[in-house]
Amino acid sequence: PLVYENRKYHIDFHLLEECFKHSKVFVLISPHNPTGTIWNKEVLIKIINLAKKHNVFIISDDVHADFTLTNDSHYLISSLDEWVANHSMICLSPAKTFNIPGLEIANLIIENKEIREKFIKEMMALGIHNPNYFSIPAIISLYKYCTDWVIYLKEYIKNNKKIVKEFFNEYIPLLDITESDGTYLLWINYKKLSINENELAYWINNLSRVKVSLGSEFGKEGDGFFRMNVAMPREKLLEALNRIKNGFCLLNNREI
C-alpha cells in the first residue's frame, strides 16, 4: 500500500492495517526496490505496532542496506523492538554491494530458535546445505577489509545518480525521477510523455539499445514507470544516456 506523491513514496497505514488483519506474514523491503525509499525509524515503529497488534511475522529484505546514500539512517527493524526481534527474519547479503551473486552468499538473522530450526529443516529438505567453498572466506574478507571501497562506491553511485538527473532535466525534462535515499537504482516516471509501455520499450530497448526494467514487472502500481540501474562505469553510463536521448529523438522524428 504505497502512495506516490511529489516524487516520493509513503505508506498508506490505514490500508496496511486492513491488509494486516488478514495476513500472517509481512514482507518489508528497505531500502525499497524499486523506489529506493529507506523507511525511517518513525515509519518502522508504526509497522512494528501493527505487527504486534495483529500478530504478523515480518520478513525484512535489507539486501540494499549498504547503499544508504543520504543522511537518513537505515535501521534493521528487529533492532527496534524485542517482540519483533523474536517474530522476524532479517535478510542480508554482500552480493549487491560487491556484485558477487555467483557466490550465492546470504545472511539470515532468525532470533527465534524454534522458527530458525524449522527454517533450517525446510532448507535441508530442499537440498540447500552448506555454502560453497569460496563463500565463507569471501564474506569474511569483504566485511573486514573493504570498508574504504564501499565508501568510494557509494559516492560514485551518488554522483552517477546526479548525472542522470541533470541529463534528463536538460534533454528529456518530462521524465520525473523519484527521490530516493538508497540503492543504485532509479525509479523514473514517464507518464508526462503520454506514451504507453510498449512505446517506451520500443524507444529505450529497441531504438536506444539500452536495457531497463519496465514498470509492469513490479505489478500494476508500476504502470508509467521504468527502473534504471546506474551501477556502472561513468563512461558506459554517459553512453547509455546519449543513446536514450538519440532514441527519443528518433521516436519523435526529430534530428539527433
What would you call each of these model-derived segments?
Residues 4-73:
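Active-site phosphate-binding strand-loop segment of PLP-dependent enzymes
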Residues 81-82, 86-158, 166, 249:
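Conserved core segment of the aminotransferase class I/II
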